[in-house]
Amino acid sequence: ENTECLTTPEHNPLRVDFNGKNSFFSYLPLNHIAERIVVEWTCFRYGGTISFTESIETFAQNLGSVQPTVFFGVPRIYTKFQMGILSKFPQEKLNKLLSIPIVSSLLKMVLKKKLGLSKAKAIVTGAAPMQESQRVWYRNLGVNITNGYGMTENCAICTQLPGEITDKPDSVGKAQPEVDIKID
């Protein structure tokens, strides 16, 4: 029996609500361990609704209509989001708009809604490394992406940042209870 599965929900690594009103967006294969834990199991544990993407072609439209409170994305998804934003707002123009306080607030709000992340309380990446520069880029848009690390062998969540610390550069946090980490 993997005690990681038993201890993780008590630590609430995604900081989801216990009110049953959480909203999750499912698009990874259902046998993917991150999909199982971050979406399915967390929803069953804390309550909420799981919405599924209809197809790869409707992914953005589906995510935009769902506006989940918890979103897990592999780094490639965030790269595609970033490329989409930069195709409409080249970096120089985006920097200029973000430097104007009122415009910056409105732009961040609109972009988060377009991305489907306007209601997200937990925005997580994992399954592959995400460049710190990309996380900083998103942070400048008001989108704080938490880095996670785990593997199938320990039921997905191996490490997490403690308490209210949701972002620390180049860190995936401390080992979960009952998880031993050895670096050779």
How does the language model describe each region?
Residues 27, 52-53, 124, 148:
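Active-site-adjacent beta-strand anchor residues
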Residues 71, 107-184:
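Conserved AMP-binding/adenylate-forming
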